[in-house]
From Swiss-Prot:
Disulfide bonds join 57-73, 149-214, 179-193, 204-229. PANTHER family: KALLIKREIN-4, KALLIKREIN-RELATED. Residues 26-31 form a propeptide. Residues 32-253 form the Peptidase S1 domain. GO terms for molecular function: metal ion binding; serine-type endopeptidase activity. SMART domains: Tryp_SPc (SM00020). PROSITE patterns: TRYPSIN_DOM, TRYPSIN_HIS, TRYPSIN_SER. Glycans are attached at residues 124, 170. Keywords: Biomineralization, Disulfide bond, Glycoprotein, Hydrolase, Metal-binding, Protease, Secreted, Serine protease, Signal, Zinc, Zymogen. This is Kallikrein-4. The gene is Klk4. It comes from the Eukaryota. Zn(2+) binds at residues 41, 92.
């Protein structure tokens, strides 16, 4: 088994995991699988994280001054795009580009197993919520197998190019038993799985840190997957945010 982060550099992180788990290598593809263009600004909590090299991860606005993302997306500083639909749009109406210099990983984040894969990023200024920029509540109830949830992101397409427009895909939550069976020995209770259906719908590299929304709440963050994306019977892994509500609230209140 090879597990890879859902970042553009997921292959490199996957190779690190091979050394730990003794897993065999397999090919990696990079995209949201079998998705479609989201309706413009239908996911107003979606954030895009940029470094000097360009877009590298997604995030989620959970407070006017705080964005959640995957811990493996950590950088020293960020430009955070909010209210974006078209990544290539120049000054898209209703969007903001904000600097952020403070990010706090969960103290128990485990690289390379991806346990507790979340961090909070504090924007240098608060945003005023609008039709295009709006925070989303973090789920307090854990996901139920069979729930239909929506994942969104700008991960690479089948042709290897990044999409201009935000992509959306509906996935079904897998059982804990299935997730544990497929991802041992790196499986952890901070994770849940979704996807893996015969329709081959999936998240993939480039989608890391982005939202999976169930029942109008932020249920999780795109974290990692196993080998090639979109394999029937192989769901991807998401950070299980219902386990972290107290930590999230404490960090926001004390920083």
């Amino acid at each position: 088994m090879m597990v890879t982060a859902r970042t553009p550099w997921g292959w490199f992180l996957g190779c690190l995991i091979l050394e730990v788990t003794g897993a065999s290598a397999s090919s990696v593809s990079s995209r949201i699988i079998q998705g479609q263009d989201c309706s413009p600004h239908s996911q107003p909590w979606q954030a895009a994280l940029f470094s000097e090299d360009g877009f590298f991860c997604s995030g989620v606005l959970v407070h006017p001054q705080w964005v959640l993302s995957a811990a493996h997306c950590l950088q020293e500083s960020y430009i955070v795009g909010l209210g974006l639909h078209n990544l290539k749009g120049s000054q898209e109406p209703g969007s903001r580009m904000l600097e952020a210099h403070l990010s706090i990983q969960h103290p128990n984040f485990n690289d390379p197993s991806f346990a507790n894969d979340l961090m909070l990023i504090k924007l240098n200024e608060s945003v005023i919520e609008s039709n295009t920029i709006r925070s989303i509540p973090v789920a307090t109830q854990c996901p139920t197998p069979g729930d239909t949830c929506l994942v969104s992101g700008w991960g690479q397409l089948k042709n290897g190019k990044l999409p201009s427009l935000l992509q959306c895909v509906n996935l079904s939550v897998a059982s804990e038993e299935t997730c544990r069976l497929l991802y041992d020995p790196v499986y952890h209770l901070s994770m849940f799985c979704a996807g893996g259906g015969q329709d081959q719908k999936d998240s993939c590299n480039g989608d890391s840190g982005g939202p999976i929304v169930c029942n109008r709440s932020l249920q999780g963050l795109v974290s990692m997957g196993q080998g090639k994306c979109g394999q029937p019977g192989i769901p991807s892994v998401y950070t299980n945010l219902c386990k972290f509500t107290n930590w999230i609230q404490t960090i926001i209140q004390t920083n």
